[in-house]
C-alpha cells in the first residue's frame, strides 16, 4: 500500500502515469498468496476503487510466470545488452529473508535455497556473499548445503 500511495502522489504531482515494478515470480505463488495474479487483481481493484485517479498507477510484473532460473537467464541477457557485468550486478542483490547483521545472505531459508538452486541450475556460482552462524562461507559451502537439502527433498 505504501508503494501505491507514493506512486499515486508522484503521478498526481508530475501529471504522469507510474508503473510499480514487482519481482514476484512463479516460485512465490505457493508460499506467498499475495504473489498470485488473483490477489494482485483484487488488490488493484480495491486501490482503484478507493482512490481518485488511481488508474494512473499500474503494476509491472514481468516474472509472474517465471521461476528464479528464468529470471537469472533473463538477467544474463540483459546484462550483456546493457554492457554490465552479471556478477557485479547480482553481487549487489539479496534474496534472503534472514540476512545477517553484516548484510550477508543466509543459505538455509527458503528464499535463499531457491536462489542457490537457480544458480546451480544455471551452472554459475552465486556472486553474493553467504554466511552462517560461524561467519562468511564460500559459495561451495552454500551450494553443497542446498544440494543436500534438494537431494533429501527429492528422496
Question: What are the language-model segments listed below?
Answer:
Residues 1-155:
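Nucleotide-activated chemistry modules centered on ATP-dependent adenylation/adenylyltransferase
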Amino acid at each position: 500500500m505504501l508503494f501505491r500511495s507514493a506512486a499515486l502522489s508522484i503521478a498526481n504531482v508530475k501529471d504522469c502515469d507510474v508503473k510499480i515494478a514487482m519481482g514476484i515470480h512463479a516460485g512465490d505463488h505457493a508460499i506467498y498468496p499475495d504473489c498470485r495474479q488473483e490477489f494482485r487483481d483484487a488488490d488493484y481493484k480495491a486501490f482503484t476503487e478507493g482512490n481518485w485517479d488511481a488508474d494512473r498507477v499500474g503494476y509491472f510484473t514481468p516474472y509472474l510466470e517465471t521461476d528464479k532460473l528464468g529470471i537469472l537467464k533473463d538477467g544474463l541477457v540483459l546484462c550483456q545488452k546493457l554492457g554490465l557485468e552479471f556478477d557485479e550486478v547480482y553481487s549487489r542483490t539479496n534474496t534472503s529473508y534472514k540476512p545477517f547483521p553484516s548484510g550477508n545472505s543466509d543459505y538455509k531459508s527458503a528464499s535463499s535455497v531457491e536462489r542457490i538452486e537457480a544458480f546451480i541450475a544455471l551452472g554459475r556460482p552465486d556472486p553474493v556473499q553467504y554466511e552462517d552462524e560461524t561467519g562468511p562461507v564460500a559459495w561451495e559451502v552454500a551450494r553443497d548445503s542446498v544440494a543436500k537439502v534438494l537431494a533429501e527433498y527429492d528422496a
